Amino acid sequence: GDKTLILQPSRELLIQNYCKLTSYGIPATIYSASCGKKELSNMIYATLGSIKKVVGQLKEMGIRNVLIDEAHAGYSPEDGSEFMTFMNELKPRKVIGFTATPCRLKNMSIGQTSYSQLNFITRMRPVYFKNLIHVIQVEEMIRQGFWTPLKYETWDFNGDALKLNSNGSEYTAESISEAVRKNGLNNLILRRLMILKNSCKSILVFMDSVESCNTAARWMNDHIRSGIADVVHGGTPKKQREAIVERFKSGGTQVVFNYSALGTGFDHPGLDCVIVGRPTFSFSSFYQWLGRAVRIKDGKDSALVVDCCNNSSRFGDIRELSIENYKGYGWGMFIGDKLITNIPMGDKVTKTDLDIK
């Protein structure tokens, strides 16, 4: 077949994707400095930062197809971006992107007012991906057994202290920590973990800061048993991070705390509980965090989501997410009846409103 390049935004995703393909006996190579391998072949798994330096060689080899995982993340369609410079030089024949969240956060302004909105990936300027060729809905994946059913536990949370940042895309780190402190949330999470450790085998916790992660893990290791908990963050050295993740996946470590390091693309089918221990205004972040729990595994019939900050009151139930080419409107992402793309974040537009237009 045609020679193919597969791009992914992180080292973890690259290794997962590469291992999955080669497990079927299909030969492939890795080209990524962060993986310590730089081999070209007819099927290359790569990160953009490394592979862009050998675009001339790729052209000579005749790479025809480019597959892009997490196509919404970091592949800027802006003229002159790293991605566009690479693609304009490579000139592949076919480019296919894959994503569970086909939208990009865009900061907008009208006069003095700044706001943010999620733009559908084919409804933005500039645009790179122009057509959707296949969509599978969440409810369909659940029905076909590709998505582990989620059980929700939602807590009351007083969000009065929360303040949006200047472009309205997310709460400020300071106000998140303040709200978490006022609700006494980190202690409540530890109290809940004391019970959940008896029923859940593998628990991933998102906290309001790396400092909170370290404090919580230390407390569990001191008071429950040494080695029950660990922390992964952006500054964790590569080898140490690999060892922590490996222990987590094999069941040696039961609880891993993180701020966002394991929020996207982390593949651990045995994960049966996700605790969201901080408020967020970002639908993409919330959806990705919950998405860590839906991988299927024999013997895992459901996964628990503990939404400590009542984020689902803002976004709705992600099990009702749909991607639709809505009559008279076009492509959009909906939660139930509510449109969530190409409108200012926080605004409410329903399918009924679209029908009236």
Feature roles, as predicted:
Residues 2-23, 210-211:
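Conserved Walker A/P-loop ATP-binding site and its immediately adjacent core
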Residues 15, 30-40, 214-215, 226-260:
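Conserved helicase ATPase core of P-loop NTP-dependent helicases/translocases
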Residues 22-57:
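Inter-Walker segment of RecA-like/P-loop motor cores
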Residues 44-86, 258-260:
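Conserved RecA-like ASCE ATPase "motif II neighborhood" in helicase/translocase motors
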Residues 49-52, 72-74, 234-328:
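Conserved RecA-like P-loop NTPase helicase motor core
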Residues 73-151:
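Post-DEXD/H (motif II) to motif III coupling segment of the RecA-like Helicase ATP-binding lobe
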Residues 130-204:
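Conserved interdomain linker/interface between the two RecA-like ATPase lobes of SF2 helicase motors
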Residues 138-148, 297-356:
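A conserved SF2-helicase RecA2
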